[in-house]
Amino acid sequence: MKLQRRHFLASLLAVPAVAALAQTGPPLVEVWKSPTCGCCKDWVKHLEANGFRVHVTETASHTMRTQLGIGEQYGSCHTARVGAYAIEDHVPARDIKRLLAEKPAAIGLAVPAMPIGSPGMDGPEYGGRRDPYDVLLLQKGGGSEVFQAYR
């Protein structure tokens, strides 16, 4: 009987550890986008193909952009949040992963102006064209710096 009680108590101690493991896994990216935007849908597919879980809310993104602290000069096609960070427009999945690994004190990342060749803007309709662009790290105090350059 004592052995069964020990096993029962040990299993109770394991519950929080199992729950913690269940909460880990691929990061969840919450996306706010227009229901009619094809490039936004392609960006979501890019994130999923790179291991992210994605939850999409189809609505105008400007309200969330403001709530997340993204300046209008960085605003573009869609807005997202992953963990404590805001993501604006066609940011590559690899840069989001780097952001989550490095954990800088920042609002998040942005790729203004929907550059051709960025994820979601790289479909066959663009004929392989790739414009140079920068992924910007948005500072909490305002301003930005280049997080990653694509040339």
Residue ranges of model-derived segments:
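Thiol-based oxidoreductase modules, predominantly thioredoxin-like and allied folds used
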Residues: 54-65, 74, 82
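Thiol/selenol-based redox catalytic cores and closely related redox-interacting motifs
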Residues: 73-151
